[in-house]
C-alpha cells in the first residue's frame, strides 16, 4: 500500500506542483528587500544607536555629573570626570568618554539618567576604519546630540508613555 501511494505521488508530481504553487504565491507579492544605501527601512523610536549628549534649549549641557550612567554600565564603557561645584550648587562634567568598542547598547545609561542627558540616538551608520575612532569624547557626544536633537526629542516624546 505504501509503494502504491508513493508511485501515485511521483506519477502526478505532487511535491513539484506543491512547491511550484507555493513559490508562485510569493512571486507576485510586494518585495521585502530594500536597496539599502539608497533606501532605508523604518527605525523604531526605541532603537538604540549611536550615543549622544543632549543640551537644554538655552544651550547648556544637560549632564549634571551624577555618574549614575557610569555606575550602571555593565560593560564599564563610560568614564566621567566631574568638575567643581558651581555657584548655584550644580556640577557639570569636565570629561565624558564612552568606549563604543566596549558598549553593548543595553540602554541602561539612558534609563538611569535623571535628566535625559545621555541617549542612544537613531543613527546606526557610524562605521570607522580604526578602533580609536570609536572612543567618543564629550565634544563628539555633544555634536551627536546637536545633530540628532530633533529626532531624539521626537523619539523620547513617542516613548514617554512607556517610561
UniProtKB/Swiss-Prot annotation:
E.C. code: 7.1.1.-
Residues annotated as domain 4Fe-4S ferredoxin-type: 53-83, 94-123
InterPro entries registered for this protein in UniProt: 4Fe4S_Fe-S-bd, 4Fe4S_Fe_S_CS, NADH_quinone_OxRdtase_chainI
Highest taxon of the lineage: Bacteria
Binding site for [4Fe-4S] cluster 2: 73, 103, 106, 109
Keywords, alphabetical: 4Fe-4S, Cell inner membrane, Cell membrane, Iron, Iron-sulfur, Membrane, Metal-binding, NAD, Quinone, Repeat, Translocase, Ubiquinone
Location, primary (coarse class): membrane
Compartment(s): Cell inner membrane
HAMAP family referenced in this protein's UniProt entry, alphabetically: NDH1_NuoI
Job description of the protein: NDH-1 shuttles electrons from NADH, via FMN and iron-sulfur (Fe-S) centers, to quinones in the respiratory chain. The immediate electron acceptor for the enzyme in this species is believed to be ubiquinone. Couples the redox reaction to proton translocation (for every two electrons transferred, four hydrogen ions are translocated across the cytoplasmic membrane), and thus conserves the redox energy in a proton gradient.
This protein's name: NADH-quinone oxidoreductase subunit I 1
Gene: nuoI1
